[in-house]
Amino acid sequence: MKAASAAAALRLEDIPNIGPSIADDLRALDIFEPAQLRGQDPYELYRLSNLRAGAEQDPCLCDTFIAAVRFMEGGPARPWWYYTDERKRELGKKK
């Protein structure tokens, strides 16, 4: 069962939208505990994940990073696709 609040998230997999695969992606970025997501830039996490993978990954990964960071900073649990429009705007600015 997923955590209802940031305080209840003890493992990365407790965070809404985070399953084993994305938890592994976060661990590859040296994020091992949910609290480490507080204050992180999800767009930078996505950029670093792409560098590590050697290719641009599915942009939905960025949406998931946004959802996870926002949740751990006290925001509501939202599905990752809630952040798709925001990500498109933000990444569009950087091009």
PLM-predicted stretches and their roles:
Residues 1-18, 42-95:
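Sterile Alpha Motif
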Residues 11-14, 25, 36:
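Residue-level recognition of specific faces of alpha-helices
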Residues 21-30:
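Catalytic DNA-binding helix-loop module of base-excision-repair DNA glycosylases/AP lyases
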Residues 31, 39-42:
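ATP/adenylate-binding site constellation spanning eukaryotic-like Ser/Thr protein kinases
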